[in-house]
């Protein structure tokens, strides 16, 4: 879309953003997060755990599994015949949720740059109750990890025009808000003549 197009002037760049708290533990506080807390407690009862993935071979194995799950998703809305995830290996922050038996349930890959982070990949690795609960559990895990890194904003760069209703509902439930981002050049102020 050209920057001077009518649609650009009308919408700017609209995207979902989660403003992160400054203090650890603050994300799940408040009445608006009651359902999120309930889902996290259920995930804990199911024995869901998480770990940060730093081993390159394990990352490649998880990427292979993620691509396979995208190609074979039972819901055509979420199925991606040719996943484009090779860039994930370029990013440092990899988190995985695991079932009580050790199976990977969800993969989260998030590029971080100062106070900003981009939700590049946040998908379940299979289908079922464990995977569903892992989404909520891992949202809190990701937020807490990002807060520890000094991140203030988590951006979901998904195309809002084509976002499935299930993902839109999940974003609202976890605290994402649609914001309009204006992209522009920094203007340098002229220094006074001496």
Language-model features, listed with the residues they occupy:
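Short secondary-structure transition/capping segments
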Residues: 62-65, 166-168, 191-194
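Positions that flank functional sites
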Residues: 58, 161, 186
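A conserved beta-strand-loop-helix scaffold within acyl/acetyltransferase catalytic domains
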Residues: 23-131, 140, 145-146
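Acyl-donor binding region in acyl/amide transferases
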Residues: 1-8, 29, 55, 113-178
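Conserved catalytic-core motifs of GNAT/GCN5-like acyltransferases
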Residues: 15-16, 177-190
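Flexible glycine/acidic-rich beta-alpha junction loops that bind and position SAM and/or redox cofactors
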Residues: 128, 164, 184-193
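Internal, well-ordered alpha/beta segment that forms a basic, Gly-enriched binding/recognition surface
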Residues: 1-31, 48
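Short, well-ordered beta-strand micro-motif
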Residues: 17-19, 96-98, 185
């Amino acid at each position: 879309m050209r920057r001077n197009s009518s649609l650009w002037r009308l919408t700017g760049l609209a995207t979902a953003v989660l403003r992160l708290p400054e203090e650890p533990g603050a994300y799940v506080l408040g009445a608006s997060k009651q359902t999120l807390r309930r889902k996290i407690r259920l995930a804990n009862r199911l024995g869901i755990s998480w770990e940060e993935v730093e081993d390159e071979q394990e990352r490649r194995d998880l990427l292979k599994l993620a691509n396979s799950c995208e190609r074979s998703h039972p819901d055509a809305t979420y199925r991606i015949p040719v996943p484009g995830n090779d860039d994930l290996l370029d990013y440092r922050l990899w988190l995985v949720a695991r079932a009580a038996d050790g199976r990977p349930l969800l993969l989260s890959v998030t590029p971080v740059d100062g106070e900003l982070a981009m939700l590049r990949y946040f998908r379940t690795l299979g289908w079922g109750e464990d995977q569903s609960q892992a989404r909520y559990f891992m949202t809190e895990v990701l937020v807490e990890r990002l807060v520890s890194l000094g991140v203030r904003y988590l951006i979901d760069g998904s195309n809002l025009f084509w976002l499935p209703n299930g993902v839109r509902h999940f974003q609202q439930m976890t605290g994402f808000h649609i914001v309009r981002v204006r992209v522009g050049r920094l203007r340098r102020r002229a220094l006074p003549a001496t």
